[in-house]
Amino acid sequence: MKRIALFLLTNVAVVVVLGIVASLLGVNRYLTANGLNLGALLGFAFIMGFGGAIISLLMSKPIAKMSMGVQIINAPRNADEAWIVETVRRFSEKAGIQMPEVGIYEGEPNAFATGAFKNSALVAVSTGLLQGMTREEVEAVIGHEVAHVANGDMVTMALIQGVMNTFVVFLSRVIGYAVDSFLRRNDENSSGPGIGYMITTIVLDIVLGFLAAIIVAWFSRQREFRADAGAAQLMGRKQPMINALHRLGGMRPGAMPQSLQAMGITGNIGKLFSSHPPIEERVAALQNSQSA
């Protein structure tokens, strides 16, 4: 709950800073002269930016269960399920968090963690992961996901996404008004936003959205390095995580929804937009780390 409160306070602080900077630069007077209220725009940017991020965060568990077909292990039906639950329990105690829900789903090798609160999260592994790895390697992957939960990565990434969303919404509309005002500077009968505003806003929403995605992906990759190190600490040595990464490098990872990729063990391709670093970089980081 503390992280959610911090999330909201940080978001409000960002909006306040945007308002102060806009006022100091004279943007407030310019927007008012052209029929746009700065406070209303900031409120709109806050709702669109942070509202979407917080809703996505709060809905992450039910969406994950539904979209991935996750079966929650309430009562283990076999030795594998009992081992998974016990492994998550052991790592959770060691990481100082409450026991997450544990699930399993049909699919290619992958795993993920999700949830708005680190003491009521979900850790799920695929059947492909269980079939394609040794138990020690699966244990390392589970440690990686528990580390994501313990580090509060779900809230952190939602916060970063919310900040980026707000900047995109705010900047695209301020620039849109500036372009529209310039294009209609000699039209004394014009009122309200025109076609210049609408086109500029749409284009900038797309362009700035891509730039924001690159920034969010960069932060996600840094969290992956930290989760790898966390798995090594939970296991007491780093070689199992290194072995698991090598194994994943030779597998075809299972697809996951975009909202879950950042908390999985492998992510989408494309260096700039990838939520995960290349396998070789993760292995090198572990080998050079001071983890066990």
Swiss-Prot record:
Sorted alphabetically, which keywords does the UniProt record give? Cell inner membrane, Cell membrane, Hydrolase, Membrane, Metal-binding, Metalloprotease, Protease, Transmembrane, Transmembrane helix, Zinc
Kindly give the membrane topology term recorded for this protein.
Answer: Multi-pass membrane protein
As to how many cofactors bind and how, the note says:
Binds 1 zinc ion per subunit.
Which residues are listed as membrane-spanning?
Answer: 4-24, 38-58, 152-172, 199-219
| Residues at the catalytic site | E145
Q: Which GO terms describe its molecular function?
A: metalloendopeptidase activity; zinc ion binding
| Primary site of residence | membrane
Q: Which cofactor does it need?
A: Zn(2+)
- Record protein name field: Protease HtpX homolog
Organism of origin is: Acidovorax sp. (strain JS42)
Instruction: Give the gene symbol.
Output: htpX
